[in-house]
Amino acid sequence: MLQPKRTKYRKMHKGRNCGLSWNANVVSFGQYGLRATAHGQLTARQIEAARRSISRYVKRGGKLLIRVFPDKPITKKPIEVRMGSGKGNVEYWVAQIQPGRMIYEIEGVSEDVAREAFRLAASKLSVTTAFVVRTVR
């Protein structure tokens, strides 16, 4: 699964996920893309599950590009532990998603294959998405 090899700090503030995506919001590398239309977080497991479903559907055709990376650690305290005594341990990693962010891109397949592959992948993700086609080459 995806996670950073090394980080400067182990834990991170919660922060706020607001605004629109100003980078990675157009299809840059492939012909078709899956764009987020809502705010949310994608865990490394969700990104991997969606990648597998796309790969299974397109089989050996096409090239898939993942445009998001889970670089934010989410911590959690163990069950039945009292409040206080510091922040919990890192449980999993997430990528913060804003509306307009391109999540996946694919090339080398027909539009209906790409559309169906992204439909299968979208059911694995926790944000609403839209299928987009590259306009300018």
UniProtKB/Swiss-Prot annotation:
Part of the 50S ribosomal subunit. The gene is rplP. The keyword tRNA-binding applies. This is Large ribosomal subunit protein uL16. Belongs to the universal ribosomal protein uL16 family. Keywords: Ribonucleoprotein, Ribosomal protein, RNA-binding, rRNA-binding, tRNA-binding. Binds 23S rRNA and is also seen to make contacts with the A and possibly P site tRNAs. GO terms for molecular function: rRNA binding; structural constituent of ribosome; tRNA binding. One of its GO terms (cellular component) is cytosolic large ribosomal subunit. The keyword Transcription regulation does not apply. It comes from Xylella fastidiosa (strain Temecula1 / ATCC 700964). It comes from the Bacteria. One of its GO terms (biological process) is translation.
